[in-house]
């Protein structure tokens, strides 16, 4: 089993609609997801919700170019850091993950918060 996991954060319709070069970003993330799956690296998905992007709304959905495969964990968060008030750490521990390759949307917000949250919890983080 791989000690590395790919963590895909907030690549959702509403978030990507406001992103610069979103088509390029999604294509690069799609390539990472494909390579992770080919190499047996677990892929974890994170979706953010808040009053402006309610859970289960169209805005909240992962962009159609990126679809979590059956069995890939999806973590729902309401804070910038995907570790805060979620079961992400427990799910990673269940798979003995020690290294996280982090990608997604809003590098200045949720990616940065999750990056530091992972470091704080002892993970080897790659952005």
Residue ranges and their predicted role:
Residues 1-77, 89-90, 94, 98:
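Active-site acidic carboxylates
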Residues 4, 107, 114, 126:
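Ser/Thr-centric signal marking residues that sit
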Residues 14, 80, 106-108:
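Short glycine-rich anion-binding loops that position phosphate/pyrophosphate groups of nucleotides
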Residues 43, 125-127:
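Hydrophobic beta-strand scaffold residues
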Residues 75, 102, 118:
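Conserved, mostly hydrophobic/aromatic
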Residues 84-85, 110-112:
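Short, well-ordered alpha-helical microsegments
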Residues 93-109:
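Active-site neighborhoods of divalent-metal-dependent phosphate/nucleic-acid chemistry enzymes
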Residues 111-121:
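Short Gly/Thr/Asp-enriched flexible loops that form oxyanion-binding sites at enzyme active sites
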